[in-house]
């Protein structure tokens, strides 16, 4: 092998090792900060890791919202129409949060049927209209 070829091979191997190290560091950082999404059925089946930051999504079950008499604690059930889990949350819920509404909760699984949320996000459809706009449009239609 000529010295020129040896030098090119050395540069190529060095570049590949630096690129591999950078990719490994990026993947390690993503693994630490990634928040995976699970359904209530997956949580009940034990597929979600316990004591690990995840997201769970589903519909708020009817007649399941229980608010504490004092404080901001709330407990409710979410379902994917196969299984149901109990979610506990301490904080102010979004304005769109209600029974029958789709939500995404971020937090940790405490056991196969309980989830402790640190953040609750209410999902809405693309046809959502604020109540003020809806009433204004209804008034215009009546005229």
Swiss-Prot record:
Subcellular localization, as worded in the UniProt entry: Cell inner membrane
Topology, Cytoplasmic side: 1-8
User: Does Nucleotide-binding appear among the keywords?
Assistant: no
Q: Where does heme bind?
A: 124, 128
Periplasmic compartment ranges equal: 30-143
Q: Which InterPro entries match?
A: CcmE (IPR004329), CcmE-like_sf (IPR036127), NA-bd_OB-fold (IPR012340)
Q: How does it sit in the membrane?
A: Single-pass type II membrane protein
**SUPFAM superfamilies membership:** Heme chaperone CcmE (SSF82093)
**Highest rank taxon of the organism:** Bacteria
Single GO biological process annotation from the record: cytochrome complex assembly
* A molecular function (GO) term: heme binding
Keyword Plastid recorded: no
Pfam families given for it?
CcmE
Instruction: For this UniProt record, give its keywords in alphabetical order, as a comma-separated list.
Output: Cell inner membrane, Cell membrane, Cytochrome c-type biogenesis, Heme, Iron, Membrane, Metal-binding, Signal-anchor, Transmembrane, Transmembrane helix
Q: So where does this one cross the membrane? A: 9-29
Q: Which GO cellular component does the record give, naming just one? A: plasma membrane
What job does the chain carry out? Heme chaperone required for the biogenesis of c-type cytochromes. Transiently binds heme delivered by CcmC and transfers the heme to apo-cytochromes in a process facilitated by CcmF and CcmH.
Write out the similarity annotation: Belongs to the CcmE/CycJ family.
Name used for this protein in its record: Cytochrome c-type biogenesis protein CcmE
Organism equals: Legionella pneumophila
Lineage at the top is: Bacteria, Pseudomonadati, Pseudomonadota, Gammaproteobacteria, Legionellales
């Amino acid at each position: 092998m000529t010295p020129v070829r040896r030098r090119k091979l050395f540069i190529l191997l060095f570049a590949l090792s630096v690129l591999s190290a950078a990719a490994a560091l990026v993947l390690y950082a993503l693994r630490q900060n990634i928040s995976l999404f699970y359904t209530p059925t997956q949580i009940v089946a034990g597929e979600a890791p316990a004591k690990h930051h995840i997201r769970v999504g589903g519909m708020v079950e009817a007649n399941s919202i229980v608010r504490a008499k004092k404080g901001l604690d709330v407990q409710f059930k979410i379902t994917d129409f196969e299984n149901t889990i109990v979610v506990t949350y301490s904080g102010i819920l979004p304005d769109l949060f209600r029974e029958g509404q789709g939500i995404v909760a971020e937090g940790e699984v405490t056991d196969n049927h309980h989830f402790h949320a640190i953040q609750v996000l209410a999902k809405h459809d693309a046809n959502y209209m604020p109540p003020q706009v809806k009433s204004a449009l209804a008034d215009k239609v009546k005229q």
